[in-house]
Design a protein with these regions (language model features):
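Intrinsic low-complexity, disordered N-terminal segments enriched in polar/charged/small residues
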Residues: 1, 6-8, 13, 20
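N-terminal metal-binding scaffold of metallo-dependent hydrolase/deaminase domains
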Residues: 14, 18, 22-83, 96
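Divalent metal-coordination and catalytic microenvironments
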Residues: 46, 63, 69, 94, ...
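Short beta->alpha connector loops
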Residues: 48, 162-169, 234-235, 296-299
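Alpha-helical scaffold segments that flank or form the walls of functional sites
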Residues: 96, 114-181, 203-220
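Short, glycine/acidic-enriched loop or turn micro-motifs at the edges of active sites
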Residues: 106-108, 167, 261, 298
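Metal-coordinating catalytic core of metallo-dependent amide/deamination hydrolases
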Residues: 172-297
């Protein structure tokens, strides 16, 4: 393929990879996101993968990034426009430059629970280990610390945008603003009581409050967007699903949920509801471009 041929032309030299994280302007308080910490910059690399057009690998190219965080140009190192001659330059020989990666699903604060209970069936893992641990430990400080650690790990390995779904989403959003990472903050809804809310109704009420808190253009310009996050078909009732669908349409935000994650989930759903989880959501009108389904390993 074109991609394989281009990559082959890189030769056998060892290379490093740089991920290009585009900061965006904001009037918020975060020092990491203020314009005084940015400057006009040209990054020259041995290879640039722009993602679009698909399969393209540009050899000996540069990317110009203006101080407001936007890409001002992509051009050959040897043929740079005069407009960029007085910009700061960063030289990356034998290195590959590409856009930041996207973590499309996660629970960042749970980094603090890494290794807490491994290699268990999902139902056992959740009910006997994770949910009891969350009931004991999760609070705003736990979420702030765990999310900060996760963001540090993501940024250090090239992930510059994340989709997060966890309790205390207002804390998650504030932490993302402080660090400068882009994020979709998915507002959790689950029928079980937890440290964030007592029931589905309270989850939805709090979700709407968090949406109002972070819906401004200032937050969107800083890379923060929102979604509803009903946990999964087996942890959310039809009544709550219908309210979530109504609000998501009114507010024009997506819905993000676990679906068809395990074989037992599907078997249990058929036994209890006489239909598979996907069919249940379809019957309620959920299938649309705004639906984000994660895992989907048991179709």
């Amino acid at each position: 393929s074109e991609t394989a041929l281009d990559v082959k032309r890189m030769g056998k030299r060892p290379i490093s990879v740089y991920w290009l994280a585009m900061a965006t302007p904001t009037s918020g308080p975060s020092r990491s996101m203020t314009s005084e910490h940015r400057q006009n910059l040209v990054v020259e690399a041995s290879w640039v993968i722009p993602v679009e057009p698909e399969g393209a690998v540009l050899q000996n190219h540069a990317v110009a990034i203006s101080e407001d965080g936007t890409i001002a140009g992509v051009f050959p190192n040897a043929n740079q426009p005069l407009d960029f001659s007085d910009w700061e330059h960063l030289y990356l020989p034998d290195q590959l430059l590409l856009p930041g990666l996207v973590n499309a699903h996660g629970h960042a604060a749970m980094t603090l629970l890494r290794g807490f209970a491994d290699d268990l069936p999902l139902d056992t893992w959740l009910k006997e280990h994770i949910w009891p641990a969350e009931a004991t430990f999760v609070d705003p400080d736990f979420v702030a610390d765990g999310t900060t650690l996760a963001i540090a790990e993501m940024l250090s390995s090239g992930t510059t945008c994340m989709v997060d779904s966890y309790f205390f989403p207002d804390t998650v959003a504030s932490t993302c603003l402080e660090t400068g990472i882009r994020a979709q903050i998915s507002l959790p809804v689950i029928k079980f009581p937890n440290a964030w809310a007592a029931n589905e109704a309270e989850h939805i009420t709090k979700a709407l409050k968090v949406f109002d808190q972070f819906k401004s253009d200032r937050h969107r310009d800083a890379g923060i967007t929102m979604a509803f996050a009903p946990h999964a078909p087996y942890t959310v009732t039809d009544n709550a699903f219908q309210k979530i669908l109504m609000y998501s349409e009114q507010l024009d935000i997506p819905i993000h949920l676990h679906l068809h994650e395990t074989e037992s989930e599907v078997i249990d759903a058929v036994r209890e509801n006489n239909q598979r989880p996907f069919a249940r959501l379809s019957a309620m009108g959920f299938l649309s471009p705004g639906l984000q389904t994660v895992h989907m390993t048991e179709l």
